[in-house]
Every structure is written in C-alpha cells, then in structure tokens.
Amino acid sequence: ATVFGGTGFVGRRLVRLLRDCGIRVRAISRHRGLSQDAGIEHIAADARDQRSVEAAVDGADGVVNAISLFVQHGGDTFYSVHVETAAKIARAARQAGTRRFVHVSGIGANTASSSPYIRSRGEGEAAVQTAFPGAVIIRPAVMFASDDAFLTTILRLLRSMPAYPIFGDGKTRLQPVYVNDVAAAITQILRQGQKPYPIYELAGPRVYSYEELLRTIAHIAGLRPVLMRLPFAFWSALAGVAEMLPQPPFTRNQVELMKIDTTASKSLPGFRTLGISPRSLEDELEAIVRPNKQGVLLR
C-alpha cells in the first residue's frame, strides 16, 4: 500500500498499523521520515510532480491520500492541495491498476461553502471520485490524540489563562474522534474483500457543544476557568494575525469550521458499519492529563 502524507498526523499511524497487519507500506512525504521502521519504505517525493506520483503508486494494491493543508503558503493553496493534487494521485492510482483508493477529507466538506478551505474539501472529493470511480471518501470529525494540535492546545491555554475566550456562543456541535480509530477504519477498508461504501463519516461516541467540550477538558484537568464568549468576527481578525506565525495556534479556516456543526450523519456508514467501537475523548484526555497534573508542561 502507498500512503501519501505518510508522516502526517493520520498517515504516520496508518503506515505503522498497515505494517503491523503484514502489509508492505510506502510512506510518501516531502521529507523522508526520520524513523527507519522495519517494513515501511519512507520515500521523499513531491506529490505535485506527476512522475513522482506515478512511481509512488506503481504496483500498489491500495493507495491512500492523507495529505491536508490548514494554512495556505507559497504555491500551496487549499485548491492546489485538496483538489488538484488529490485528483493527480487518484488518476495515477487508477492508471496503475490500484484495486482500492481511499481519500481522507473531513466532515463538513461542502462545494457550496463560502470558506475556501471547506469548499476545497468538497471539490476535492468530487475530483477524486471523477478521477477514480469507486474511490472511498473518509470524512473524519476533528481528530484528537496526545500529540494533536487540538486537545493539547486547548489544555495549554486553559492552564495558562484564568479567563478562556470561546468561539461565538459556544453552541457549535462537535463529535471528536480518536485519530488511531480513523487509521484503523482506513486499514479495514483497504483489507476487506467486499466492496466498501463510497463515503464513511467517522466520529467519536459523544456529541458536545463547544462549551461542553471545554468544560469537560477543564474538569478532567482539575481546572475551573471563566469562559468568555467572543464574536466570530473577533476570532477571524485574530486568526489572520496568528497565521503570520511559523506555527499558528489557530487559523481562519478553523474559525470558519467552528461556525458549523461537525457531527457524523446518521444516514452515512461509519464506525459501526466497520465493527469498530471508537475510543472516547474522556479516556484519551485522562492519559494526556495524568502526567501533567503536577504542573509538567505538555510538549
């Protein structure tokens, strides 16, 4: 199997899980992975380059596109990465005779959205399905883990700020999903013999309002912050400034995502269809918070 974005948040977990299942794996990224995992071939390649893509998918039974972009910079735009590059990989996989192609998108993807990020996700899905008929689209909710940029950022800010500003009225609904469960779902889809569904929406076992999520994190961490509601216009302006930083704490596209509910559709298949019981946010939070309750800073 070939995994594009093989050193990313989802990709690095996926390649190890595939390896552990006895599958030979190529992990494709712009920079060769530092780890020399047995059974994983790390390849430095530019997914924008047609020849590099063709070489990467050659002979692969399954191909996964897990490349994503959260901040536009240089020649990398949401459209170029989520639509053009995704379609290029899908076409190359089809021409190479790949049996199964999986494209990682996101819940909320919508071609009619005014947000360039959300719209590009929807357009990317359509481009992939055209380039590789029978492609499987994976739409995860916001993903979490001990090394994420979601829970850990919130926890750091809750620890450092006596008053915590929240997006809008705090009523936006989220259904966070453990990233390892997403990797497990993709692995199962690649391995299963029967024809998969065209779209899966993967979300955790509980739906939270944004305010409920913050209070849950604070409670498990033993914190009692004051929550301040601030309008989305304020957040958008602040995010524009934050994006100038090398590693922005949040971006304008994340602000746009916080305006819409990102919960799994009851009409689309998900973890239950695959026989997977997703891990709860509370379980992972306990693991993140436990070594930090004595004041040890998260890395």
Residue ranges and their predicted role:
Residues 1-21:
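N-terminal Rossmann NAD(P)H-binding glycine-rich loop of SDR-like oxidoreductase domains
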Residues 4, 28, 66-67, 101-107, ...:
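SDR active-site strand-loop-helix element
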Residues 14, 20-21, 37, 111-223:
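Oxidoreductase cofactor-interface core, primarily capturing Rossmann-like NAD(P)-dependent enzymes
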Residues 23-30:
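Conserved glycine-rich Rossmann-like NAD(P)H-binding loop of the short-chain dehydrogenase/reductase
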Residues 33-95, 106-113:
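NAD(P)H-binding glycine-rich loop region in Rossmannoid oxidoreductase-like domains
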Residues 49, 85-88, 100, 123-124, ...:
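Conserved cofactor-binding/catalytic machinery of classical short-chain dehydrogenase/reductase
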Residues 95-100, 132-133:
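A short helix->loop->beta-strand "cap" motif at the edges of active sites that frequently abuts
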Residues 186-251, 265-299:
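Mid/C-terminal beta-alpha module of Rossmann-like enzyme folds, strongest
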